[in-house]
Amino acid sequence: MKYTALTLLIGFIYFQAVAQHSMQGYISDEKTGERLIGCSVHILGTTEGVTSNNYGFYSIKINKLPAWVVFSYIGYQTDTVEFVPAGNNIDVMLSQKTSNLKEVEIRATSAATSTPRTGVLTIPVQQIKQLPALGGEVDVMKAFQLMPGVQGGSEGTSGLYVRGGTPDQNLILLDDIPLYYVNHIGGFISVFDVNAINDIKLIKGGFPARYGGRLSSVVDIRMKTGNSSEIKGEYGIGLLASRIFIEGPVLKKEKTKFMFSLRRCNLDIATRLITRMQSGLVFSAGYTFYDLYSKITHEIDSDNSISFSFYNGRDNIFFKQRDPVAAGSDTFFDYQANIIWGNTLASVKWNHQYNKNVFGTLTFAYTHFKYLNRVQYEEKYKSDKEVIEKASTSFVSGVNDVILKKDFDYFVSNTISL
C-alpha cells in the first residue's frame, strides 16, 4: 500500500513538473456566445491535445515556447492563437464556417488531437436538422439509429436498441439530470426539441463512473444557454406540431442570457372539431402533447457562473361525452377520461473554476415522471348545472428524484483528465 501511494505521488509530481505553462479558458460561438462542447484543442506541430468539457472549458499544458494553439470544431472555422504566459483565462470565439465549393487539397499532417474515446458517438445539431423528418418534426434520437451499433425498433419509432439492449436500459440525461420515458405518440417522436439543444452524444460502452451502472447506453443531452449578443427567435406551424423559440441577453449584456422553447402538438385541434361536429357537440376525443424548455444563465465573473434549467412535457389522451340521463330528462351526465404522462425537471448549477487545472460543478435538481389514468363522472341539472352526483377514479404512478452532487474536471496533463 505504501509503495502504491508513493508511486501515485511521484507520478502526480512528475505531471506537474513537466508542464511549465498552462493555457485555459472557454470556447464559444462568436455570434451567439453558446459554449462549444467537445472542441478540439492542440498545440501546433505536436500530437498533444485536449477537448473542451461539457461547459466549453479547456486546459492544455504547454512545455515549450514559443507555442501556437489550434482550436477546431465541426462546422466552424479553425483558429490559431499564440500562447502568451499571462495567468489569466484565454477565451476563444469561433465563427461558423461557410461552404465554398473550390478545389480539393489533400495534405498529410501529423496526428493533432487527443485520441477519441471508443464507443462515443456525437452528431452536430446542425446535421440532425438536415435529416428527413416525420410530419416535419426532426428527432435527435432517430439520428443515432443511423450509427453503427445502434438499431431502431418498430418502423418509425425513436427507441434506441444499443448492442442488443432495449430502450429501457438506456440512461437519458438532460443537463446531467435523468428523464424517464422520453417518447411521444407511442414512440414515434422523442421529447427532445432540436431547437433547444446545444450538444448530444451517445456512449455505447465504457461508461464513466459518474453515470453509474447501465446495461445498454448513455444519451447525454445539453440544452442551449441562449444568445449573449442579441434577442432572436423563430416560430413554425407544421403538420404535426407548432413551435416557438426565443433566446437572448437580459439585464446587463453578455452577463445574463436566456433560452425559451415551446412545442405543441396540433392533432387535438382537428380531432376535437371532427368529433364535435359528428356528435352534435356532445362528444370530443383526441390526443396532444407539449414540450417546454427554458434556461437562464448568469456569469458572475470569469471564474463563476450560475444557471437554472427547466423542462416540462406532457402527453394527454382525452375523451369527453355529455348525454341526458334518460329521454326527456332534465338532468344530464358529463363523462371524462384522461391518460396523462410526462416529465418535469428543474435544476440549479453553479460552475466554478478553482484554478488553471480544476473545474467544478455543484448541482441541485429535481426530476419527476408521472403517469395518470383518470375517469370522472358528474350528473347535473340542465337549468342551473347544479351537480347532483359526482364520482372519480384515478390511478397514479410516478418517480421522484432529488439530486445534490458535486462534479470535478481535473486536467492532469494533455493526455489524462479526471
Where are these regions (language model features)?
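Periplasmic N-terminal accessory/gating domains of Gram-negative outer-membrane beta-barrel systems
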Residues: Q77, A111-D168, L174-F207, K224-T225, ...
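Membrane-embedded beta-strand positions in outer-membrane beta-barrel channels/transporters
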Residues: D91, M141, G159, D199, ...
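Short, acidic Ser/Thr/Gly-rich low-complexity loop/linker segments typical of extracellular
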Residues: T47-F57
